[in-house]
């Protein structure tokens, strides 16, 4: 997504772009844009306490996070311990909770936090729980985040609050990627009910100045909620719920629609 967003931001000709993710999760695109100086700063928001704790730990306790990645055992006993920390959702220790999020994201099947461990509890599968836990690579990613931390803001607000807060800012490019309609309860700790999707659409439809993109799984409900805005299919090469190719729905603000068509 980062390359696609870079092209759009270039077409929009925004001065000192501010990239905002109200439902951040991994926020990989935002970090890539920041590292390449495509955007001046980024705001990462997620109401999920584990996601918030990860980004807080990664930006404010980078060295400690890197040390944990270097030292942590890769075993089923440790996986169980980290799962219990994650389930506790105790934000009084953002380092512990944030690291548990990171550990499970790297050791669970397809990175799904509530999913099972890669290779199964018996570790009898083709791939084991260490398959996606390359210590050197992960330490490098954390180091990059730490080096950019003075240009990263982290918050744990309701996503609609963030959309409303930045909706009148013409320098903002907002990537709104809320919980899915169909598989939301399987993929997110804070999944959405129908009314939540409706409330978000009401908020997005009131945005006046910010440039924005919304992405969802294909859903008649979402198509109807955003029927006054440009919509198209977006093909992704990987999706957490189904490795391989996946098609999502992309919805865009008027200015972004023009940029997509340019």
Per-range role (PLM):
Residues 1-10, 14, 58-175, 179-185, ...:
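SAM-dependent nucleic-acid methyltransferase catalytic core
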Residues 4-5, 15-77:
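Conserved S-adenosyl-L-methionine
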Residues 25, 55, 102, 212, ...:
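A residue-level signal for conserved active-site and pocket-lining positions in enzyme catalytic cores
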Residues 26-29, 48-50, 107-110, 159-162, ...:
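Short, solvent-exposed loop/turn segments at secondary-structure junctions
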Residues 38-40, 147-152, 227:
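A short helix-to-beta-strand connector/capping loop
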Residues 187-191:
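Short glycine-enriched, charge-decorated loop/helix-capping segments at active-site entrances
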Residues 193-262:
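Long, positively charged, glycine-interspersed low-complexity recognition regions
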């Amino acid at each position: 997504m980062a390359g696609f967003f870079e092209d759009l931001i270039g077409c929009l000709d925004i001065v000192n772009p501010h990239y905002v993710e109200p439902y951040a999760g991994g926020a990989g695109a935002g970090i890539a844009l920041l590292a390449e100086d495509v955007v001046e700063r980024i705001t990462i928001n997620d109401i999920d306490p584990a996601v918030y704790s990860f980004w807080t730990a990664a930006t404010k306790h980078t060295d400690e996070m890197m040390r944990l990645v270097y030292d942590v055992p890769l075993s089923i006993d440790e996986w169980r311990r980290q799962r219990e920390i994650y389930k506790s959702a105790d934000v009084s220790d953002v380092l512990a909770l944030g690291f548990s999020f990171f550990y499970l994201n790297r050791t669970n099947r397809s990175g799904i936090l509530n999913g099972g461990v890669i290779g199964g509890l018996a570790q009898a599968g083709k791939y084991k729980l260490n398959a996606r836990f390359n210590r050197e690579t992960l330490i490098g990613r954390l180091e990059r985040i730490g080096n950019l931390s003075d240009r990263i803001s982290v918050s744990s607000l309701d996503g609609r609050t963030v959309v409303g807060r930045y909706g009148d800012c013409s320098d903002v490019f907002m990537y709104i990627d809320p919980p899915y309609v169909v598989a939301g309860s399987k993929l997110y700790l804070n999944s959405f009910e129908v009314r939540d999707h409706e409330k978000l659409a009401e908020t997005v439809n009131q945005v006046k100045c910010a440039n924005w993109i919304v992405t969802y799984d294909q859903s008649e409900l979402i198509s109807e909620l955003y029927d006054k805005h440009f919509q198209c299919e977006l093909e992704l090469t990987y999706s957490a719920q189904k490795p391989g190719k996946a098609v999502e729905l992309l919805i865009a603000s008027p200015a972004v629609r023009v940029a997509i068509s340019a």
